Swiss-Prot record:
Family: Belongs to the universal ribosomal protein uL22 family.
GO terms classed as biological process: translation
Any one Gene Ontology cellular component term annotated for this protein: cytosolic large ribosomal subunit
Subunit comment: Part of the 50S ribosomal subunit.
Pfam families, per database record: Ribosomal_L22
Protein name: Large ribosomal subunit protein uL22
Keyword Ribosomal protein: yes
Entry GO MF terms: rRNA binding; structural constituent of ribosome
Domain of life of the native organism: Bacteria
InterPro entries hit by this protein: Ribosomal_uL22, Ribosomal_uL22_bac/chlpt-type, Ribosomal_uL22_bac/org-type, Ribosomal_uL22_CS, Ribosomal_uL22_sf
Keyword terms of this UniProt record: Ribonucleoprotein, Ribosomal protein, RNA-binding, rRNA-binding
Lineage of origin: Bacteria, Pseudomonadati, Pseudomonadota, Gammaproteobacteria, Methylococcales
Function, as annotated: This protein binds specifically to 23S rRNA; its binding is stimulated by other ribosomal proteins, e.g. L4, L17, and L20. It is important during the early stages of 50S assembly. It makes multiple contacts with different domains of the 23S rRNA in the assembled 50S subunit and ribosome.
Amino acid sequence: MEALSRHRTARISPQKCRLVADQIRGLNVAAALDLLTFSNKKAAGLVKKVLQAAIANAEHNEGADVDELRVKTVFVDEGPVLKRMSPRAKGRANRILKRTSHITVLVSDN
């Protein structure tokens, strides 16, 4: 039994979010939630909400036992990029890229 949850267009760069996602891959959901709760990275809060949604989906839709669930797959893809300008000297401008992420978490009891 598998349950999926996604957070699309999260306002955090994929590079920063993947650091947290790599830590919880393959863990028991209780251990993953503990790790995310005590991490002081912004991405940990976002990934934690997606993980909690996946657990709720497994429990409600599939009737799964929460104690047996594991994080089967977690990955972070690039979302759309917001392009902004920063004024510089002599009338020039630099481009600032505000990156977004698509966070996907799949939990399974296998």
